[in-house]
């Protein structure tokens, strides 16, 4: 099978790459000066989110800027996020394919405002298969880190059910997730 373009992605036998034209379009953008331009930016980035580690955290300043009650105030945090994302996209790695039945690994990450996961395969070198991320709603931001971690895992299983059905996925984290998931009684007594 050769290389080709499908649904805006470049497909190769060894994996999937973001369309370089989409990356160039983001890199050509100047600093947004109004909410409409921020919406254009976030739309362009959303099309590339599967290639961006911790997407929700990286784009949070832009989404905060779009909140109606806050008003439009492009600040240093937005400027840094904009520059960092452009730089990140220039170095974006190819997402590799996985063979049926191959063991996969998932790292979960939590922050104050988002949960993220990366699905990897490991053949001596870890290679990303898929990145996912979720911005936390107000109530979720008050979860304990372990609860956010479980939320991250639930979100990952909902976003990537085909990987969990076709592969053994080892979830890697610094938290004692296994002991929590084995508990039979989840009531607070």
Each model region followed by its residue ranges:
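Flexible glycine/proline-rich, aromatic-decorated loop/lid segments
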Residues: 13-18, 121-131
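Metal-dependent nuclease catalytic cores in nucleic-acid-processing enzymes
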Residues: 45-48, 146-166
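Acidic, metal-ligating active-site segments
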Residues: 110-121
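Secondary-structure transition/capping motifs at alpha-helix termini
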Residues: 120-127, 159-167
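Two-metal-ion RNase H-like nuclease active-site motif
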Residues: 102-110
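Short glycine-rich phosphate-binding loop at a beta-alpha junction
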Residues: 105, 168-173
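A short, polar/acidic, helix/strand-boundary loop motif
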Residues: 124-151, 155, 174-185
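C-terminal reverse transcriptase regions that engage the nucleic-acid substrate
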Residues: 1-103, 175-177
């Amino acid at each position: 099978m050769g290389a080709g373009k499908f649904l805006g992605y470049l497909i190769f036998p060894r994996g999937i790459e973001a369309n370089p034209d989409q990356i160039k379009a983001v890199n050509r953008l100047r600093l947004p000066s109004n909410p409409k331009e921020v919406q254009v930016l976030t739309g362009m980035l959303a099309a590339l989110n599967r290639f961006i580690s911790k997407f929700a955290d990286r784009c949070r300043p832009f989404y905060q800027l779009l909140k109606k009650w806050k008003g439009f105030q492009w600040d240093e945090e937005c400027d840094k996020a904009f520059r960092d994302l452009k730089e990140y996209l220039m170095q974006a790695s190819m997402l590799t394919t996985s063979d049926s039945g191959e063991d996969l690994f998932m790292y979960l990450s939590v922050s104050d405002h988002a949960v993220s996961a990366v699905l990897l395969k490991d053949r001596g070198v870890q290679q990303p298969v898929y990145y996912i991320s979720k911005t936390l709603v107000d109530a979720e931001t008050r979860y304990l880190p372990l609860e956010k971690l479980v939320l991250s895992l639930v979100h990952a299983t909902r976003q990537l059910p085909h990987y969990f059905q076709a592969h053994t996925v080892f979830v890697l984290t610094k938290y004692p997730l296994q002991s929590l998931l084995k508990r039979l009684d989840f009531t607070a007594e």
